[in-house]
Curated annotation (Swiss-Prot):
Keywords: Cell inner membrane, Cell membrane, Membrane. It comes from Enterobacter sp. (strain 638). Signal peptide: none annotated. The lineage of its organism: Bacteria, Pseudomonadati, Pseudomonadota, Gammaproteobacteria, Enterobacterales. Interacts with the SecY protein in vivo. May bind preferentially to an uncomplexed state of SecY, thus functioning either as a chelating agent for excess SecY in the cell or as a regulatory factor that negatively controls the translocase function. This is Protein Syd. HAMAP family: Syd.
Length: 181
């Protein structure tokens, strides 16, 4: 496990939860995750849940992605998806506002790996360098991803070669993220 990335993700999650506590006096809330089972759920309300991050309970790898694609995934990506269970978190990096994707439960972890595989299959078909997404943007054509060749965090326009480097590593990227509520 990439400890630097795991620590950076844990620190950002703490900043996010602290900001939520300051603004609302509660743990983070979600309407989108209402009715979706997770070890993160503290309380279920009328149309939303309160959640807090929980330790990841499965093997801490995305080996299914590696096996399916016959590649070695950057250690930082393993750490990103297997450090914790948590809800997706809104964040800002420089001028980009995004939804930082997280694994909500054991079932969600399987779905995330399937989506990563689908993303990599499309890239392979288009002869693009492999990336693994970590966040979504308002534009459905752009994502924040980790380049699997060098570990850089990039803003990528899906299906194209358009990629802008945002940070030299996932840990650096996470350490610069600001919570958005």
């Amino acid at each position: 496990m990439d400890i630097e990335t795991a620590n950076a993700l844990t620190a950002f999650t703490a900043r996010y939860c602290d900001a939520w506590h300051e603004m609302n006096g509660t743990w983070p809330q979600s309407e989108e995750l209402y009715g979706v089972p997770s070890p993160c759920i503290i309380t279920t309300m009328d149309d939303k849940i309160l959640w807090q991050p929980q330790p990841f309970s499965l093997e801490q790898t995305v080996n299914a992605v590696e096996r399916a694609m016959d590649i070695v995934v950057q250690p930082a990506v393993h750490a990103f998806y297997t450090t914790q269970f948590a809800g997706d978190m809104q964040a800002r990096f420089a001028n980009e506002t995004m939804t930082l994707l997280q694994t909500w439960s054991e079932n969600d972890f399987q779905r995330v790996q399937e989506n990563l595989i689908g993303h990599l299959v499309t890239q392979k078909r288009l002869k693009l360098a492999p990336t693994l997404f970590i966040a979504t943007l308002d534009s459905e054509l752009d994502v924040i991803a980790v380049c699997n060749l060098n570990g850089e965090v990039i803003k990528e326009t899906l299906g194209t070669r358009k990629r802008d480097v945002l940070a030299p590593s996932l840990a650096d990227f996470l350490n610069q993220l600001e919570p958005v509520l």
